[in-house]
Amino acid sequence: MRPAAATAPKWLLLALSALLPLWPTAKSWELTIMHTNDVHSRLEQTSDDSTKCLNASLCVGGVARLFTKVQQIRKEEPNVLLLDAGDQYQGTIWFTVYKGLEVAHFMNLLGYDAMALGNHEFDNGVEGLIDPLLRNVKFPILSANIKARGPLAPQISGLYLPYKVLSVGGEVVGIVGYTSKETPFLSNPGTNLVFEDEVTALQPEVDKLKTLNVNKIIALGHSGFEMDKLIAQKVRGVDVVVGGHTNTFLYTGNPPSKEVPAGKYPFIVTSDDGRKVPVVQAYAFGKYLGYLKVEFDDKGNVVTSYGNPILLNSTIREDAAIKADINQWRIKLDNYSTQELGRTIVYLNGSAQECRFRECNMGNLICDAMINNNLRHPDEMFWNHVSMCIVNGGGIRSPIDERNNGTITWENLAAVLPFGGTFDLVQLKGSTLKKAFEHSVHRYGQSTGEFLQVGGIHVVYDISRKPWDRVVQLKVLCTKCRVPIYEPLEMDKVYKVVLPSYLVNGGDGFQMIKDELLKHDSGDQDISVVSEYISKMKVIYPAVEGRIKFSAASHYQGSFPLIILSFWAVILVLYQ
């Protein structure tokens, strides 16, 4: 007779079965993705609003602090990537002087694994991208939807790639890049680069990676949060999307600073084929380091993803060697930071959160300077030959803090107006101006750069109406008058307007200005116009004056349920 087989107690079997889901599988693999986007030349630490650092204990970001955190994570975790989603170029005196050499130098020191091209990488033309950056970096720069043609094709061949396969901890990870197809309207890429639709261009490159047996694929790019989500939904085979361009702040839990989250981090998109795809951005200006943990199964499917942007505040020390290197590069910039142009006794709000959504006093200052620069007194019938100014909110890049004794330097202005354009004089019909103001708000709320700041103009919008029918009132300051007053815009009348050369060329989608302008005279450099005005005024205090207004319907539409609730509350009170 055979002995009975030994059986485990039922309680032990139950306990083991409960632990099985927690037991690590040999096939799963975890990747840490550190990421930045829209740094915009913030190599030094800045104040909390990304202006010049005034109190070191309250300052954030900078490459020396970023280096410390990146090195710490690399030492603590086995499988790590450091990625950048574009727009390292443009934003402070650093780029004005060094023109991209500083970007290549410090990104190499940080050891980036890959970067996507942003629209601002083309601000100095293709040559301003090739020589300072593409030929000097030690990591791949990516974009799958930019195609070179003509004489540029052989010149730029191999300097940027559609994708790159990286080896990380014994696994292979594919990184595929993309860039906003609107770049020709936003920057200066020239005519020999074609910017294709992102989704259409990405799919065949992802398919190529799949044929190479790469089953973990990150889309890294610079087209904005809406496009990031669309790529996650539509491009088969993309596992993670790391984006930029819209300075989107995502966070799970209580945010550590003043940025308001646009959603949880990571933001999960369900793809058309049923996968859960994490999408991330890390705000802008080097204030945060994006930190995403992704677990893949043996087939390359995302099992879990979690993390949060890390606020790079003063609790993280600045690396001494990188800081010393920054100080050496800084010497060449000192002349720009010591010359005082004038003083402000109010905060000059040039933030994207303000100037791309409503009237901002920095926009008012710039427009007032532009009109002042064009003061001419042709005869006794006219107090001036031009009274109107428009400036795209996306061209205003930084605030100026009045708490540094109110001092305004050339360096401060270079952060506000970093593009080096001119303020030009044009003649336009009233009908063209009406089209321009409809364009200003046709996609209002997306933090896009076409929202217009004004001078000599009063405009009222109703955002509850459909796009291209949102301007409900448009008045302009008369010029042929002894006492200037605001008069309704006349569609067939020809008006003079001062505006950035960028808009003259159709930038930010203002094609109607380029196509319909009747006369154009080039003006003075933008930063010179504003600096001379500040020097003349000595002390400035621009206000928000009601130049741009939104009708009551715009506000009521979003609050309709609250209005109904309030109505019934009043009825109940009356009849109690």
From Swiss-Prot:
Compartments it resides in: Cell membrane
Residues where Zn(2+) 2 binds: 38, 87, 119, 222, 245
Residues the record marks as carrying a glycan: 55, 313, 335, 349, 405
EC class name: hydrolase
S-S bonds: 53-59, 355-360, 367-389, 478-481
Cofactor(s) for this UniProt protein: Zn(2+)
Signal peptide: 1-28
Record-annotated site: Transition state stabilizer: 120, 123
Tissues expressing the protein: Expressed in the brain.
Binding site for AMP: 356, 392, 397, 419, 502, 508
GO biological process: adenosine biosynthetic process; adenosine metabolic process; ADP catabolic process; AMP catabolic process; ATP metabolic process; calcium ion homeostasis; inhibition of non-skeletal tissue mineralization; leukocyte cell-cell adhesion
Enzyme Commission code(s) on record: 3.1.3.35, 3.1.3.5, 3.1.3.89, 3.1.3.91
Catalytic activity: a ribonucleoside 5'-phosphate + H2O = a ribonucleoside + phosphate; a 2'-deoxyribonucleoside 5'-phosphate + H2O = a 2'-deoxyribonucleoside + phosphate; dTMP + H2O = thymidine + phosphate; CMP + H2O = cytidine + phosphate
Entry-linked InterPro entries: 5'-Nucleotdase_C, 5'-Nucleotdase_C_sf, 5'-Nucleotdase_CS, 5_nucleotidase/apyrase, Calcineurin-like_PHP_ApaH, Metallo-depent_PP-like
Keywords recorded for this protein, A-Z: Cell membrane, Disulfide bond, Glycoprotein, GPI-anchor, Hydrolase, Lipoprotein, Membrane, Metal-binding, Nucleotide-binding, Signal, Zinc
GO MF annotation list: 5'-deoxynucleotidase activity; 5'-nucleotidase activity; ferrous iron binding; GMP 5'-nucleotidase activity; identical protein binding; IMP 5'-nucleotidase activity; nucleotide binding; thymidylate 5'-phosphatase activity
Membrane topology, record value: Lipid-anchor; GPI-anchor
Propeptide cleavage-removed residue intervals: 552-576
Self-association state and partner proteins as the record states: Homodimer.
Family classification: Belongs to the 5'-nucleotidase family.
Protein name per Swiss-Prot or TrEMBL: 5'-nucleotidase
Originating species: Rattus norvegicus (Rat)
